[in-house]
């Protein structure tokens, strides 16, 4: 009976570790973004998704040749953004912004947003990078 109980406890502990691993890796900056690929660009907001666990800002960026690329910017949680003064209504479609962040490891046009500068010059920390991002000072 004691051996059976030990097996059940060990099995439950293993199950918790297996289930928790993907959630932990999802929230690690280094799992999705490349600290060696900082990016900075200006663009036009096309939409904002105010969803958990991360809000997303979609930005059209005009390249030097005139073509337009759509970038997806991962931010912190909506609650984090609210605490920093950013609301869903803060970035209406057409708003020109500057984004500082880090490109995704897979090379897609997806980035971890670190700072966002509004047309009036105000810079907001997007709260997504968290511990593990380069030069974590905020």
Model-derived segments and their meaning:
Residues 1-11:
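Bacterial N-terminal signal peptides that target proteins for export
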Residues 9-20:
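Bacterial N-terminal signal peptides
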Residues 21-25:
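Sec/Tat signal peptide C-region and signal peptidase I cleavage site
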Residues 26-42:
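Short N-terminal segments immediately surrounding and downstream of signal-peptide cleavage
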Residues 43-45, 96:
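Conserved hydrophobic positions within beta-strands
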Residues 51-61:
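Short aromatic-glycine-enriched beta-strand elements
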Residues 83-99:
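Short nucleic-acid-contacting surface segments enriched for D/E, G, S/T with interspersed K/R
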Residues 104-128:
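OB-fold/S1-family single-stranded nucleic acid-binding modules
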């Amino acid at each position: 009976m004691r051996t059976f109980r030990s097996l059940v406890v060990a099995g439950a502990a293993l199950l918790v570790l297996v289930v928790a691993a993907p959630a932990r890796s999802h929230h690690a900056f280094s799992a999705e973004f490349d600290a060696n690929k900082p990016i900075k660009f200006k663009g036009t907001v096309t939409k904002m998704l105010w969803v958990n666990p991360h809000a997303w800002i979609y930005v059209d960026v005009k390249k030097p040749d005139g073509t337009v690329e759509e970038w997806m910017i991962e931010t912190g949680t909506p609650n984090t953004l609210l605490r920093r003064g950013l609301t869903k209504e803060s970035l209406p479609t057409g708003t020109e912004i500057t984004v500082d962040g880090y490109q995704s490891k897979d090379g897609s046009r997806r980035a971890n947003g670190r700072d966002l500068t509004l047309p009036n010059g105000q810079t907001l920390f997007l709260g997504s990078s968290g511990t593990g991002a380069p030069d974590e000072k905020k």
